Amino acid sequence: MEIKTQIKECIKSQPEPKQSEMQELDNLILKMMPNCKQWYFDGKNEDGKQVAHPTIGYGNYIRTYKDGSTREFFRIGLLANPAGLAVHIMGIDDKKFLIDRYGKTIGKAKVGSYGITFKSIKDINLEILKEAIQNRIETRN
């Protein structure tokens, strides 16, 4: 199945209002990254076992692991989880960056080393979320 089709199906599989909000965030990210590589990870390992939430990815960077190996990965991830929605901002070396920069201003959200999780778009300052995404778009690798 084509990635764009998988993404549409992933969004459509969500109950309302999560579905509409996930679509709104997908549109927002694509507007910010119009020609980016798109990804879809179904959350299953090689044995078909569900190990993570299905994730839509945008953009790319080279991820370097502790053993020195590298892998291409998405810069921005969007997913639905039991708590609501999450935007993952990948490849940030400083694990406190998101917390320190956006934790106090984004609104009612849990901000971690690479993720911003919130129940609803209405609970957060969307301009601050856009700023966090834009910061990662502009950062090399």
Residue spans of the language-model regions?
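Charge-dense, helix-prone N-terminal extensions
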Residues: 1-141
